[in-house]
Amino acid sequence: MHSPSRRAIALPALVGIITSATLQQPSLPRSPSAVILAAEQAIASRRAAAVRQDWLGRLRRDPSNRLARLGIASFARLAYDYAAADSFIAPLLTRSGARPDSIAAWARIETALSAGQQWRIRDADSLFALAASEGTAARDGSAEGGALTRLALIRGRTQGVEAGLRLLDSATRVLPTNDIANRALALAYRAQLVLARGTPGAGPLADSALILARRANAARVEGIAYNVLGREQYRVRRPDSAEVLFGLAVRRLKDAGDLVGYAGALQWRGYLLRSRGELGAAERDLRAGLAVGTIAGQLTLGWTEMNLGYVAMALNDWGEARRHLAASRVLLDSARDRWGSATAMTAEASVRWAVRDWAGADSLLRDAETQLAQSGNTSQVLDTRVQRLRYALARRDWPRATEMLALARDTTMRGRSAAYVDLDYYDALLALGTGRPNDARKALDRSQREAARAGEPPTYLQLARRAEAEALLGRLDTAEASLRAAMARFERYRASRETREQRLAALGYAGDENDPDVGVATVVAALARAGHTTSAFDFSERTKARELLDGMARREALRDPSTDRPEAREAALTKVYTRPITLAELQAALPESTAVVHFNTGTWNEPTTAFVLTRDGTSAYIVPPADSLVDPVRRLVLGLQAKNDARPQARALGAVLAAPIASALGAGVSRLVIVPAAPFNTLPFDVLELPDGRRMIERFEISYAPSASVYAALRRRSLGTDGDTPVRAAAGARGVLAFGAPERPRQSGLARWDTLPPLPEAAAEAREVARTAPRSLARLGRDASEAALKRMSLSDVSVLHFASHAVVDPAGLRGTALLLSPGGGEDGIVRPEELSALSIDADLVVLSACATAVSGGHAGDEGLRGLVAPLIESGARGVAATLWAVDDQAQRLLVRRFYQRLARGEPTAAALRSAKLEALRGGAAPRDWAALVLWGDPLTRPLVTGQLSQSPATAARPH
């Protein structure tokens, strides 16, 4: 948490930044309001050093010069040197019982401004009120009106918009007509409050404030007006104009030395960039605002922390989001900022929703709406109602959704409009959910017409939902065209993201209508029902493992000698879109006896489609919606983990998922490659029961692939085929490299590290697997380090084995890592991006750790937010990983049997099946054998002796 005290900028430092000693030194203004404005102007025009030096000289020559003292105090406050400001201002304040004059009233305003900058809100409120009364007593309309103007913004946040507007009415009545700067400030603050209230007129008010501010040469007020205009342009769906205006606000407030306003403008621009998906630029602005806000005050810090929370949510990093939002709530509550506190509650509701705490999310939104309504912030009330509407739609609570849509429309119809809220789109969602696709199509027409009037092209969501409506109406050609346009638009958006993390975030499942694959499942199912299997499969495949497929393509391209040229290398590194495999191409690539089972699921009760593909044909089956299978899958997995009798759940899910597969396949198919979709990413298909009572593992070898395209690419990596068996050239020694029982780092930065249990069998397991093949090595304890992993040559390793802990955060990449020993300049925490940067040429990587294959529930079909995907991208042809934490001894036994069969030359999937069947027939519970699953090519033979050279081992030699 940030301390409420703020580090001051030393006056010499400020002078060094904005000095201009060669300019003519001005005279001291004759009124206190003009003195304070002159100090602000001197900073904005970079004459602060000369002006302050002149005023200090006047005070030294005449210690009774109260105007010079007031000006020097103002310079100190503007430099955030509050101690110096207080020492200069104290002699100017009215003594008890004395009649105040104008200078005393403005001195009181200075103390209030100082308190406000430090966000001591109660002190600032009472001091501005006292200053207003002192201005009245001194018959100084500028002091009275100036104090009331500044008090109005505080009261607007703490007592409601109407209270603030009433104070501005009073201020306007007493401000002299020639006090242009304070009149401009009053207009700018009125524009802010009107914008919050949601009624029209904020833009013209801000324009008028800008005109007066320019006349008064008041850079700070100019910046405030630009900021309001930017917010107004964002409200009416003109984000490009808003970005320009926020940029002007940032520049003018920085020039004015107003760090509070500067940080606020950075926060607003960061908010805009975040809403446009420009997460890298947004985070840069927000972190810059946070740094400035550390000096400027708690209000800015609170809002900036909140927006950093939103950035973390956009990256599906819910833990990071919670941390920022908790800090935001503390800061905003301590500042009594009711708007900010309520907005932070709505953000926290988003996190609660993401982790399926629906009751908690709704409770927070109700409280936030009440608080915002009491404060008169109708614009944010509308936003909160729309958020409640979205959640009601996602829960299929049609009565609540209808109620919230009506309330939102009522808010806009009473003139309190936030034009950026597309209620027609939500009307379409409600119509789709209640079985009225034609009404949905009409609502989408209205939505797109409104967007066209604003100069915007159709959004991905509009196009995808139109495809869904057309599919439900049986207009399949139109549905295909609309979905194709939606996907093309989304891929352009994804390609524009700056980093892998941002591209993955764009693909992340948000749990509501922001899911990037909305509507796809409905269209796929409609096409499959109509017999358009090829089109249905092609659309489904385009939703899967896009970032992983692109990463693999980039890695392959870099191996091409032509990429030695800088321009070719740059093109390979920046390539984003790789064409997925077609149905015909996949069938041609399938080995004998192999079937691919490809699932497509949706949200909002959309149907699930299962494609079963062999060399000879394709069939498609419609199974229950994924929404109805989330809880059965969870109950089965939890039952397996607890060693409960999960046969009833395995039988029930088998009837839904396994039976159609078995009925579609003849006896000649013995190998399944499953391409899962949420919620099946964590489901061990091995344990599902077939109609004849057998488990699937008893009939099939089962492996998994993130997508059909990734599976085909991994087959190509195997260098060719001889029947069903990949053939590898024996290029040097190829053996097993095992890492086991690494030391724990003293400080991991991962909260869950300290809770992980010891792995007493890990060292023995690593030694044992290293003995299954010649030319192998086990690195244990301190030697099982991240530094060794990164520095060794891994191209000569056929099997890379990790008997160590891992932390997999299903909600985000930042909390996911493989844990090795620290040392050699490395912390021992190997994160996904570090794994994907390795150069691996292994047939198999084994992650014999806890839940290393877990895919985030928020990751949708992109899935695999664990450690599997980065290892595949780095060059592995197969990855064996665990779905849940397994007993250490049971895991060692299963791994031993697995390696024994690999050493006999069995293909990877067959070897794993044999090891599992031995455990099953020996009476082991499914918990002890079903967790370990294989992702990738099932046919590699990593330990075929004939493939191993007799030359000395090099796999373990550091480079």
Cite the ranges covered by each PLM segment.
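N-terminal leader/linker segments that initiate helical-solenoid repeat arrays
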Residues: L23-G71, L78-A83, S87, S102-W106
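Residue-level detector of the short coil/turn that links helix A to helix B
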Residues: R46, Y80, W119, Q159, ...
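TPR/Sel1-like alpha-solenoid repeat signature
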Residues: I72-A76, R108-A115, L127, E144-R155, ...
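Amphipathic alpha-helical segments of tetratricopeptide repeats
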Residues: L93-T94, A132-T136, D169-L175, D207-R214, ...
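Alpha-helical solenoid repeat scaffolds used for protein-protein interaction
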Residues: N307, V330, T346-W353, D357-A359, ...
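Catalytic cores of enzymes
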Residues: T534, A572-H959
